Structures are given as C-alpha cells and as structure tokens.
Amino acid sequence: MNEKLTPSIGVIGSGRVANAIGLLLHAKSLTIAFVHSRNTESGNKLASKLNCPFIASIKDTNADIIIICINDDEVQSTIEQFSKDQKVLYTAGSVDIKMLHHEKCGVFYPLQTFTDHTQKMDNQFPMLIEANDKELFLDMIHLCEKSGLRYEKCNSEKRKEYHLVAVMLNNFVNHLVYLSQQEGDVLASTIAAIYHRRMSEAGLSIHSEDVMDSVLA
C-alpha cells in the first residue's frame, strides 16, 4: 500500500498557537505553504521561521489544509472567506463545529496553554480533534502521527467543557500563586503546587508563568 501523501499546510495567525504549531510541523519536515496574518510584522517573522512566504491577502492563500490560529470570535468570519471545498482546521476551544456550516471543517485544539511565542508543543498534552468530513479527519490523524503529537477524538460539547475547566483552573492557580508570592501565603503555595501537578498528570496545561517555578521548588 502506498504511503499517504502529506498535505501542504497554510497557517493563518501569527500568535503563540500559530508559532507553536507551525514550528512543530516545520521541524517535522511538513510543507508549510504560507503564513497569513493581519499583523504584518509578526506574520513575516513567523513566515521567515517556517521558510515560507507571507501572504498579505487571505484571497491569495492556497494550501491543501489551512490551520486557523486566531481568536475564537474571529473564526467564523474567517472560515466564511474560503470556498466550501477548502479543508480548514481551527484551534479555538469554545467554537462549536456545527455552527460554522463549512463542508470540510475540523478542530485542531491543543489542550495546552502557551505563554509566549517561543513555547513549543508539549506531547504531554493531547491534541483534541474533530471533523465533519471523514477524509479531513484521516488527514488530521496523519498530521498528528507525522508530527509525533498525542491526539484524542473529542466532540465540540466535551471540548468546551475541557476548555472551560482548563481556564478556570488556570485562573485559580494563578490567584494562589499571586497570594503565595505577594502575601507569603504558604498554604496557597502548597495548594497551587498540588493542583499544578495533578492537572499536569491529567493532561490539562496550567499557565502561571515563571512564578510557578518557585512554587514547585
């Protein structure tokens, strides 16, 4: 049986998620066809890292699969600009795939918090995937396997729950870290460390920036 051909990938966005996913795919020798971003400066920087062109107009983009790494509230209006037969993935955690009405649409949601543009994908946290097209779903599995990513099939309803829990826990732990750092609250420090470890073991990323290093010391 012939090996499945790896599709070319377009990246829309130039923020933390776009950088993490783009750099991982590029490191695994997948073809990045372009980067498009409303932020020309950061978009050009990412394109340079991925050794691909920066495309200023979304109308000029072309790739087998386009990964949309932008704010949740901008996903629908962006997807609507593509033809129905264009395969698109988005990384938003709270957007229900049924609300988009795009024929070949998928969710490529990393259950991981990214603190800056240099943070890499962590295989400890799974990629939650969903698609309304069988061929696209198989493409997503192929991408995950090619790039060495853990993945789990997850519908929009369940993904929203995970996303909400991750955000709530993230905020809770950050508050505990603040108390421990600003007010010397030893109990808050201990609880924050416990939650951080437990959630990491469960596959939920918690972002408390560099201060967590001292809490876990």
Outline where the language-model segments fall.
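Hydrophobic Val/Ile/Leu positions in short beta-strands of Rossmann-like dinucleotide-binding domains
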Residues: 10-11, 68, 129
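Interdomain hinge/lid region at the active-site interface
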Residues: 182, 195-217
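Electropositive phosphate-/nucleotide-binding environments in soluble metabolic enzymes
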Residues: 15, 40, 72, 108, ...
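Internal alpha-helical scaffold of NAD(P)-dependent oxidoreductase catalytic cores
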Residues: 42-49, 119-161, 165-200
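NAD(P)+-binding Rossmann beta1-loop-alpha1 motif at the extreme N-terminus of oxidoreductases
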Residues: 1-56
